[in-house]
């Protein structure tokens, strides 16, 4: 009876049922509907790894077919698969630039050389550079896609750090005590020196200490998240590019440490935290907004994290995505068992 009377009342008393309310109700109805998602089924022998989000509806993965490695995109809404890049050499790494419509693909035939290919989203080659090592740590500048920071390791794990400029196709050596630096903004690097987090201006070599007694850090674009220990607590702080603290928070349980972190915007980040002291580690996906924990969801396992829009790919194989707000989990990749 109620459902019949409501539209009658709304029709008679227009002020009680405005067009804006109707729009809001329609938006809520759409939001509550589960969006259709296609599933990719692949052989364990063929698929090599999932690279992450290409955009909010498509995921990149690498497979092997007809003696070639292939970089493919899979559209979750349509199920369409597109080939973006193929190579007779092994594809071992793929990165998606956060602001430019570009992809980075690393290939190698053996341990003596690797080639870094820069492509657009259609798969067109834009640049490539050869490095005399296949063990590389590659940091792509989030602001300027023409700049790469490359650490090349040798067999004895000594290393050389180089800055690659795609504008003039040059490699310039960078001397640092840490083989795993990251970009902070367009022209600065951040790295660990003993227990200090240090930033350095590339043009002058000027150094600034950002934090002491640090455990680890994660930088993106022009901000850096630093994890440090203060007594029995873990302190997290987000700093801007000039070293000013934007916000911070404490975690009482120091057994949980940051495993992965992704900045969604200037004020929001997603973290996976894991209790490594347990025989079977417990992991959570945590949403932090302006230094406040606003959402915590238990994960079946730790592993990698890649977020785009309202979804995060999770797990060691990135075969599942989770809705950040609702906690809905969908396994988009099914691996067929070996016969």
Protein language model regions, located:
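Blade-loop segments of beta-propeller domains
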Residues: 82-107, 114, 125-134
